[in-house]
Structures are given as structure tokens and as C-alpha cells.
Amino acid sequence: MGDVVQKDQAIAEIATDKADSELQHAFPAIRFVKAFSSVGAARMINPAFAGGKPTMFYCGNDADAKAFVARILDQFGWESADMGTAVAARAIEPLAQLWCIPGFRQNTWTHAFKVLWE
């Protein structure tokens, strides 16, 4: 029972973690950009899917750094979706947990998210 409680506490801490904003505050000269948190290594580069390019969410406080990451995402084969400042990292991070669910349930680790824009 204790092991389960510890794991639940760890998951709860991850879900409310604000490490990105704390890092940005501790190191203001460094230009942090949050990206690649919702995909496995197998599909990080050239993520070919029949349904088209998957979407990678990113955020950060520096416009130039985000533009650089957006170019990397494009070169790697992703549709990029700018979610704003580093505050959005707290919303993006749980996507990693959601991404893991099919992996754990079905042992499939080659999936990605896609935003359908209208």
C-alpha cells in the first residue's frame, strides 16, 4: 500500500510541477523553450503518419528562441503550435502523461497528437 501511495504522490507532484517557470526565474539570461514533451524518441524526427503532420506544442518567454524551436520542429517534420509564454508549460506537461496512457495500456509508443484547425 505504501508503494502505491508514494507513486500517487509522485504523479501528483509531476502534475503540479512548475519546474520550467522556476528554472526561468533562477536563470533569467537563459532562453528556455518547452517542446518535445509529448512524443517518444521513435517519432521525434520525421514523424510520418497517414493523417498528416502531428502537432507539437511549445512555449517560452523569448520570441527569438521560440522562433528557432519552431524552425527545428518544421525541419523535424512537425506542425508547431505556439502556446505562449512559459506559464503554458504547466498545461503542456500533462500531455506527456496522456501520451503515455496508450503505451502502458496497449504497448504502443509510436503515436502523437494532432490539432485540427478550422
Predicted regions and their residues:
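Rossmann-fold NAD(P)-binding glycine/threonine-rich loop
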Residues: 1-48
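A short, glycine/Asx- and small/polar-enriched loop/turn
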Residues: 50-52
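Active-site-lining helix/loop region of Rossmann-like oxidoreductase modules
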Residues: 54-118
